[in-house]
Structures are given as structure tokens and as C-alpha cells.
From Swiss-Prot:
Organism, as annotated: Streptomyces purpurascens
Noted pH dependence of activity: Optimum pH is 7.5.
Cited function: Involved in the biosynthesis of the anthracycline aclacinomycin which is an aromatic polyketide antibiotic that exhibits high cytotoxicity and is widely applied in the chemotherapy of a variety of cancers.
Quaternary state and interactors: Monomer.
Protein name: Aclacinomycin methylesterase RdmC
Thermal characteristics: Optimum temperature is 37 degrees Celsius. The activity at 30 and 45 degrees Celsius is 58% and 87% of the optimal activity, respectively. Exceptionally high temperature stability.
Domain AB hydrolase-1: 24-277
Family per record: Belongs to the AB hydrolase superfamily. Hydrolase RdmC family.
Keywords: Antibiotic biosynthesis, Hydrolase
């Protein structure tokens, strides 16, 4: 395991790796406002033990990557997709299996459209299609209105987690406890959730960010890609896997099926009991389906 700082335009991105660099590369793209440590070490090692060179990185404005005022230095999903490619360049990787979670699933769709030559395969989990306006859906759900796309909007557990995240926490212990409570809500009750495990991970995430207690927030200011870009997904030819979680409160299960329907090469898998989180109880089945996909794409 080693660390590397890679340039992407005028920002620097922190990254690290697991496994043998001689193995096929797999890039992990985390969700919004989360650093690379949103991918637990244990999960990354499980993928590496399956024969992959696993690389993860801090998005800009998270962890140890460049952090700036978003209003003064705005960016969009095009830049975030270019960041992912810059990480591949920084590790000397021409093509990689790319796995994106939540907002990372949106980024990977943009990678598939704008940088398809860098992909060996594509995996998207806990996300939705480019034609879904999640921001508008959240607003409509909060007003008690149905979504305009006919798919279920974010569920009450997500709204509960949002409310919790907006509550101030006094000191490190309170901040860690708040984060653990957030993840317990998002994980749901379908799979075991270990508070001590998540507390340990959040302690590491805070240390990784230099002891800063406040969670990053810049990605809340992002504008989603134009919904019209979803039509371009019909041209994607790379082997694609869409993974939906049975109890995802942010992108409920039909969203995965909808996303898979936008890409001719996509197949759909579902992780029973899983919510919008990565407790160790889902690492085994999740890694198994990802490894099977990358092997079939080789």
C-alpha cells in the first residue's frame, strides 16, 4: 500500500492503492463530500485479494486533496470525471475497471461518455441515471409531492439523515457519534450494522482530513449534468454492471433498474438488505459481484 499526490489541472488529489500493480487496475470513485476513506480499507483489500490493483482517491474539497472555496473556484461533473482520469494518469494506468458509488455513479457515467477509452469495465452502485434530477426530487419529497420522473424519490430515512447532519456537534466524540448515527440511518435494518466499526472508520476519516471535524460540503453546490446527456448512454459499449441496494433510501431499488435500462451493455444486480452504506456485512456479497464482473470483462 502506497500513497501518491497527483495533479489535475490546478488542484492536487491524494490517492493510495492496494494490491499488486501488475494486476488489472480498479479505480474506486466515492460519493459526494466523502474522501477516499469512504471506501473502507477492508473492502478495498478484499477486492485486491481478488486479483485487482485497487486505487482510491480523495475528491477535490475532501480529505487531503486541494480544498478551496467553491464559490471562488466552481467546478462541475466534467471536472470531477477529469479528476478520476488524472488519478489513472498519476498511477500510470491506461485502462481501468471503474466503480462509482452514489455521486460517484454519476461521475462514472460522465467518464463513460467523455473518457470511454480509459475504461475496461464500468460498475455503478447506489446511484441513478443522468436523466434523474435528484435535487428536484428531494425538494418535491420534502413538500410531499410525487417526483416527475415516475420513480420513487428519496425516502424518509434520508431526510432524517439530512436533518441529523445539519445539527451542530460539540467536539470530536460528538461529531463521530453524529456520523455513526447518520450511517446507521442510511444503512437501514436489513443488514447488521456495527456502531464501533463505523466509529473507528470515522475516527480515521477525521485524522485523514487533518483533524477537521466539520464534514465537507462543497459537493452540495454542484449542478447535475444536463438530463439530455442520458441519451448518450445508449452509445456506451464497455461492459457495465449496475448494483442496486434493496433498502437504499436515496436511490431506491427501481433506480438501478432504470439506469441499467439506459445502457445496452448493462446488467443489473441487487444486494439483499443493503442500504446506502458500506458496513462490513455487505463487503462479501458486494465484492463477489464486482469481482465476477471484472473477470468477465477481461
Amino acid at each position: 500500500m502506497s500513497e501518491r499526490i497527483v495533479p489535475s489541472g490546478d488542484v492536487e488529489l491524494w490517492s493510495d492503492d492496494f494490491g499488486d500493480p501488475a494486476d488489472p487496475a480498479l479505480l474506486l470513485v466515492m460519493g459526494g463530500n466523502l474522501s477516499a476513506l469512504g471506501w473502507p480499507d477492508e473492502f478495498a483489500r478484499r477486492l485486491a485479494d481478488g486479483g485487482l490493483h485497487v486505487i482510491r482517491y480523495d475528491h477535490r474539497d475532501t480529505g487531503r486533496s486541494t480544498t478551496r472555496d467553491f464559490a471562488a473556484h466552481p467546478y462541475g461533473f466534467g471536472e470531477l470525471a477529469a479528476d478520476a482520469v488524472a488519478v489513472l494518469d498519476g498511477w500510470g494506468v491506461d485502462r481501468a475497471h471503474v466503480v462509482g458509488l452514489s455521486m460517484g455513479a454519476t461521475i462514472t457515467q460522465v467518464i463513460a461518455l467523455d473518457h470511454h477509452d480509459r475504461l475496461s469495465s464500468l460498475t455503478m452502485l447506489l446511484g441513478g441515471g443522468l436523466d434523474i434530477d435528484f435535487d428536484a426530487n428531494i425538494e418535491r419529497v420534502m413538500r410531499g409531492e410525487p417526483t416527475l420522473d415516475g420513480l420513487p424519490g428519496p425516502q424518509q430515512p434520508f431526510l432524517d439523515a439530512l436533518a441529523l447532519m445539519n445539527q451542530p456537534a460539540e467536539g470530536r466524540a460528538a461529531e463521530v457519534a453524529k456520523r455513526v448515527s447518520k450511517w446507521r440511518i442510511l444503512s437501514g435494518t436489513g443488514v447488521p450494522f456495527d456502531d464501533a466499526e463505523y466509529a473507528r472508520w470515522e475516527e480515521r476519516a477525521i485524522d485523514h482530513a487533518g483533524g477537521v471535524l466539520a464534514e465537507p460540503y462543497a459537493h452540495y453546490s454542484l449542478t447535475l449534468p444536463p438530463p439530455s446527456r442520458a441519451a448518450e448512454l445508449r452509445e456506451v459499449t464497455v461492459p457495465t454492471l449496475v448494483i442496486q441496494a434493496e433498502h437504499d433510501p436515496i436511490a431506491p431499488a427501481p433506480h438501478g433498474k432504470h439506469l441499467a435500462g439506459l445502457i445496452p451493455t448493462a446488467r443489473l444486480a441487487e444486494i439483499p438488505g443493503m442500504g446506502h452504506a458500506l458496513p462490513s456485512s455487505v463487503h462479501g456479497p458486494l465484492a463477489e459481484v464486482i469481482l465476477a464482473h471484472t473477470r468477465s470483462a477481461a
